[in-house]
Regions:
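Catalytic Walker B motif of ABC-type/P-loop ATPase nucleotide-binding domains
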Residues: 177-180
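Conserved ABC ATPase "signature" region
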Residues: 82-83, 123, 130-148
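Helical segment within the ABC ATPase nucleotide-binding domain
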Residues: 192-205, 224-226, 237-240
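Helix-to-loop junction immediately C-terminal to a conserved catalytic motif
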Residues: 67
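Short coil-to-helix segment of the ABC ATPase nucleotide-binding domain corresponding to the Q-loop/switch region
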Residues: 112-119
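Conserved signature/switch motifs of ABC ATPase nucleotide-binding domains
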Residues: 151-154, 172
């Protein structure tokens, strides 16, 4: 399988309605502990899938499977229809060029300034230096940090580091963004700023995403708000509206206990789910 997932092939598959992400009866365990048990779900183009569940339920492991950092024991993980299990390491590297990732820890290079951190992926792809600079400025402007371009991570607050991480994730205009607890460890005001940027990326760029959060408030804010480009920030959808492209996946003890819409989750009759979201 050569030149897997080049831009043209990816665009063709998106146009045909191929799911961006598909887990098909995925199981994964470490030694005798089964972490994920028969996980199946699909994520369509333009959809935001919010992944909820108690700590230790397998959420972060699921995210690593979606990026090919782990492979399942059984079942299949597909990105745009391509099976990750069938890829060589080179092909997995090519696949990751279509995936942006935002970690809770930000995972910035402390020895590089903001510009070089954001530019890192494009430099690895040998993009023209002038184009790299222009795209870095564009990405930093998106997260409202263009004035921090020459600063180093040690000079940034936790929230600013997280915003740089988002800029780095979006600079290659990926088909999929994986947000692993992007507001973890942040205060409520800073968390709201990060969610504002996630909603902005969803509504302005239409990027497909998986997002893990431990904050139910963040999840339901995303589902009930939209980004207003004229105002420059997100706003509540009028008349109790709900974003149609935001759906939920809830894991508990390694199993999918809910896969559906915001309304379906809000009106669930399942006792465990009702207690979890209350």
């Amino acid at each position: 399988m050569t030149e897997i997932m080049n831009d043209e092939q990816a665009a063709e598959r998106i146009a045909k309605g191929v799911p961006i992400v598909e887990f098909d009866h995925v199981c994964l365990g470490f030694e005798e502990h089964q972490v994920l048990k028969d996980i199946s779900f699909k994520v369509a183009h333009g959809e935001t899938r919010i992944i909820l569940g108690p700590s230790g339920g397998g959420k972060s492991v699921l995210m690593k499977l979606a990026n090919g950092l782990l492979l399942p024991d059984t079942g299949d993980v597909r990105i745009l229809g391509w099976s990750l299990q069938q890829m060589t390491q080179r092909e997995l590297f090519q696949m990751r060029a279509h995936v942006g990732m935002v970690f809770q820890e930000s995972a910035l290079f402390d020895s590089l300034n903001v510009e070089d951190n954001v530019a890192y992926r494009l430099e690895e792809e040998h993009v023209d230096p002038q184009e790299i600079h222009e795209r870095v400025v564009e990405a930093l402007r998106f997260v409202e940090l263009e004035k921090a371009i020459d600063k180093f991570p040690s000079e940034l607050s936790g929230g600013m580091r997280r915003r740089v991480s988002i800029a780095r994730a979006i600079i290659s205009k990926p088909d999929l963004i994986l947000y692993d607890s992007p507001t973890g460890g942040l205060d409520p005001i800073t968390s709201n700023t990060i969610i504002d940027l996630v909603v902005k990326q969803r509504d302005v760029s239409g990027t497909t995403s998986l997002l893990i959060t431990h904050r139910l408030q963040d999840a339901f804010t995303m589902a009930t708000h939209r980004y207003n480009e004229q105002l420059g920030h997100m706003e509540k959808i009028p008349n109790g509206g709900i974003d149609p492209n935001t759906r939920f996946l809830v894991l508990n003890e390694g199993k999918v206990v809910f896969d559906g819409t915001t309304l379906e989750l809000s009106h669930t009759s399942d006792p465990w789910l009702k207690d979890y979201i209350s």
